[in-house]
Amino acid sequence: MVKKHSKKYLAAAEKIDHSKKYSLADAATLVKDISFTNFDSNVEVVFDLNVDTTKADQQLRGAIVLPNGSGNPKTVVVFADGEKAKDATQAGADFVGTDDLIQKVQSGWTDFDVAIATPDQMAKVGRVGRALGPKGLMPNPKEGTVTMDVTKAVSDAKGGQVTYRTDKNGNVAVPVGKVSFDSDKLAENIKSVSSTILGARPSTVKGTYVLSAHLASTMGPGVELDVSSL
């Protein structure tokens, strides 16, 4: 079934030259110009990668601290005790604890955006994996959320860290800011993300790695990027 788009979407799409690929600077400006929502939309960059996600070594996953932040305040939970709990609190974590937080999650509470845990707490956190996993909240070493350095982890999460991972089709979608951001700040964030994705190329990938890349705001049409400008 063909998806029907709104008049606003179609009007925005008409402003895009679909026969060309846009430079990073031009795409950042255009996405801001054609955004039509009545709220401060998120902006996302999507990479279509030539990877085989059935192979473990071609599954990308990690975290990036955007130089200009994401524009989305994060509620951060830290599973830690003792001195590490104190460090997390001082770093600005919203909720810090161990068994008490586990019990809250078991009762259905997942009203937070990022969960961080010290390695010694992961056995306990694993008990609520079914609640955290499907929501993308399970602490993970690749994303820097299973760590003894909770101060840095909380600081990164609060300071604009975003996570990424390939989906089953080899696509990676990463939020890079808001349409209210200056276009140069959006471009800086996108450049940071693209550098990370390009640097994470699996050694077993042959031929072209990035098949295409698009930039879009919430509910808006995608603007194809000139990969060479990244």
Swiss-Prot record:
Pfam families: Ribosomal_L1 (PF00687). The keyword Magnesium does not apply. GO terms for cellular component: large ribosomal subunit. Keywords: Repressor, Ribonucleoprotein, Ribosomal protein, RNA-binding, rRNA-binding, Translation regulation, tRNA-binding. One of its GO terms (biological process) is translation. One of its GO terms (molecular function) is structural constituent of ribosome. PROSITE patterns: RIBOSOMAL_L1 (PS01199). Coiled coil: none annotated. InterPro entries: Ribosom_uL1_bac-type, Ribosomal_uL1, Ribosomal_uL1-like, Ribosomal_uL1/biogenesis, Ribosomal_uL1_3-a/b-sand, Ribosomal_uL1_CS. Belongs to the universal ribosomal protein uL1 family. Part of the 50S ribosomal subunit. Binds directly to 23S rRNA. The L1 stalk is quite mobile in the ribosome, and is involved in E site tRNA release. Protein L1 is also a translational repressor protein, it controls the translation of the L11 operon by binding to its mRNA. This is Large ribosomal subunit protein uL1. It comes from Oenococcus oeni (strain ATCC BAA-331 / PSU-1).
